[in-house]
């Protein structure tokens, strides 16, 4: 069993070290992660400059490879330029903060898993709700249990799984729930400030609150203490709208 691990918080993030600890007993583990935090990078690739790969030599990150690029760069380089045999599983995380609803379109954590999925490799993204790494030990334990369950009871077909873990002590977790993506309200407006020269600068505002957090969604599950397991797919075609768009077809 060979597992490729990546993340978007950077190779020094506690969540990456936790995921490495969780999965190392299950087989050979290769870590390739960004040098810097790339939260919100989505599926971006670095095409304007060459990329470099470095290796950490001490601490909890000893042996980790890190790249001066995005999460997708990391998985792409690992699969096409570093690893001779395709790994059995790509796992991303553990992210600091949830990736639910429309978050999956922006998330570098989910994007790293998507890149593995595009190469035909079962892929799982792990995120811990809320910031600050509280109860990371619980998220670490859940990550190992989910991967162990996948290995003992594989899912059918191509696998792209988005897992969100409540920020709770392990004993307080309510269990696991299979969920669909919820929906958010619009994000908050940008925050306008000025630089020392008086010129305007802008900070992207916070994500919107949950709009659809009904039962069955990832938002609902996590809010009620459950680990949310959401299978994803990449076909964004609106099949219902396709029928009406055909009216625009030329002869």
Curated annotation (Swiss-Prot):
Chief location: cytoplasm
Q: Where in the cell is it found?
A: Cytoplasm
Instruction: List, separated by semicolons, the cofactors it needs.
Output: a divalent metal cation
Annotated cofactor note: Binds 1 divalent metal cation per subunit.
Which SUPFAM superfamilies does the record associate with it?
Answer: SurE-like
- Record's keyword annotation contains Transport: no
Question: What keyword terms does UniProt attach to this protein?
Answer: Cytoplasm, Hydrolase, Metal-binding, Nucleotide-binding
Q: Which reaction does it catalyse?
A: a ribonucleoside 5'-phosphate + H2O = a ribonucleoside + phosphate
EC number(s) per entry: 3.1.3.5
As one GO molecular function, the record gives: 5'-nucleotidase activity
Instruction: One GO cellular component term, please give it.
Output: cytoplasm
Indicate whether Metal-binding appears among the record's keywords.
yes
Give the main EC class: hydrolase
Q: Which InterPro entries does the UniProt entry name for this protein? A: SurE, SurE-like_Pase/nucleotidase, SurE-like_sf
Sites where the protein binds a divalent metal cation = 8-9, 39, 95
* Protein family: Belongs to the SurE nucleotidase family.
Any idea what job this protein has? Nucleotidase that shows phosphatase activity on nucleoside 5'-monophosphates.
Protein name as annotated: 5'-nucleotidase SurE
């Amino acid at each position: 069993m060979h597992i490729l691990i990546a993340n978007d918080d950077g190779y020094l993030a506690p969540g990456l070290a936790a995921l490495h600890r969780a999965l190392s007993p299950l087989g050979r583990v290769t870590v390739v992660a960004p040098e810097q935090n790339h939260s919100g990078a989505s599926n971006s690739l670095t095409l304007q400059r060459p990329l470099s790969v470095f290796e950490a030599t001490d601490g909890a990150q000893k042996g980790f490879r890190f790249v001066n690029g995005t999460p997708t760069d990391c998985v792409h380089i690992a699969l096409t330029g570093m690893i001779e045999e395709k790994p059995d599983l790509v796992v991303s995380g553990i992210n600091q903060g949830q990736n639910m609803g429309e978050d999956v379109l922006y998330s570098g954590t989910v994007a790293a898993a998507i890149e593995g999925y595009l190469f035909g490799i079962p892929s799982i993204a792990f995120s811990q709700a809320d910031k600050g790494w509280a109860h990371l030990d619980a998220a670490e334990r859940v990550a190992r249990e989910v991967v162990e369950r996948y290995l003992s009871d594989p899912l059918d077909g191509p696998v792209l799984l988005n897992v969100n873990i409540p920020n709770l002590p392990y004993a307080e977790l309510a269990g696991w729930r299979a969920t669909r993506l919820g929906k958010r309200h619009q994000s908050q407006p940008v925050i306008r400030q000025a630089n020392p020269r008086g010129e305007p600068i802008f900070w992207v505002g916070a994500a919107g609150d949950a709009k659809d957090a009904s039962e069955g969604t990832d938002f609902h599950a996590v809010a009620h203490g459950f680990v949310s397991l959401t299978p994803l797919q990449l076909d964004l075609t609106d099949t219902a709208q396709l029928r009406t768009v055909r009216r625009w077809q030329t002869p």
